[in-house]
């Protein structure tokens, strides 16, 4: 998850977003990993369905005078003998919010880029790459039910939160009304996330 906006010591100039993120008294023990690395960690566990069991982290502060990390690489061990790599940086000059996700398996791999959020690449071992797009009949039922716009229109950040709130509201409503539907899985974060 590379970003470049903290490539200079802008917190010394009073930039509010940088000031609190790089201040240990406010941000805590980490800046880069605590800020954007946590998003990567959450996505890794959510997408794979596996928990991180061990890690080896190299957190670095490259910008002189900064009190917390601004770059980090982490080697991960997950359940089912799975390995992973997490890289988060706020000093990658030229990058905005370049979140990229790749999952590799025995028969293929998945590739997704935040800069092209409506596209999922499915690479196969012995077949051509498939390009999956939102709001098309070739994606799963859950994906279709969480899509608000026709194919070709970008789904946005706000819509993702709307899906979470909608799923939580539906689960809560069904609990209050004592409705049970075992076939419906409401996807929203809980205290364990």
Question: For each of these PLM feature ranges, what is it?
Answer:
Residues 63-66, 92-95, 111:
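Short glycine/serine/proline-enriched coil/turn segments at secondary-structure junctions
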Residues 1-66, 120:
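Predominantly a Rossmann-like dinucleotide-binding segment in NAD(P)-dependent oxidoreductases
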Residues 67-71:
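A short, glycine/Asx- and small/polar-enriched loop/turn
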Residues 85-88, 112-113:
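Beta-strand scaffold of nucleotide-dependent catalytic cores
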Residues 35, 189-192:
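Residue-level signal for the nucleotide or nucleotide-sugar donor/cofactor binding architecture
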Residues 11-13, 17, 21, 46, ...:
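C-terminal glycine/acidic-rich active-site capping loop/insertion
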Residues 38, 87-95:
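Glycine-rich phosphate/pyrophosphate-binding beta-alpha loops
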Residues 51, 80-82, 91, 106-109:
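Short acidic/polar mixed-charge low-complexity motifs
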């Amino acid at each position: 998850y590379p970003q470049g906006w903290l490539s200079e010591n802008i917190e010394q100039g009073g930039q509010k977003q940088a000031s609190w993120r790089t201040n240990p008294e406010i941000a805590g023990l980490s800046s880069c990993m605590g800020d954007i690395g946590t998003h990567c960690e959450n996505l890794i566990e959510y997408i794979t369905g596996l928990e991180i069991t061990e890690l080896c982290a190299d957190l670095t502060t490259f910008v002189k005078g900064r009190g917390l990390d601004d770059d980090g690489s982490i080697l991960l061990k997950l359940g089912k003998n799975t390995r992973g790599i997490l890289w988060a940086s706020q000093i990658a000059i030229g990058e905005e919010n370049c979140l990229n996700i790749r999952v590799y398996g025995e028969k293929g791999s998945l590739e997704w880029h935040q800069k092209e959020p409506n596209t999922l690449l499915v690479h196969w071992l012995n077949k051509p790459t498939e390009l999956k797009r939102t709001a098309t009949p070739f994606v799963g039922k859950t994906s279709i039910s969480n899509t608000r716009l026709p194919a070709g229109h970008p789904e946005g950040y706000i819509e993702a939160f709307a899906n979470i709130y909608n799923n939580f509201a539906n689960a809560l409503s069904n609990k209050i009304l004592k409705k049970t539907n075992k076939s419906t899985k409401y996807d929203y974060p809980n205290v364990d996330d």
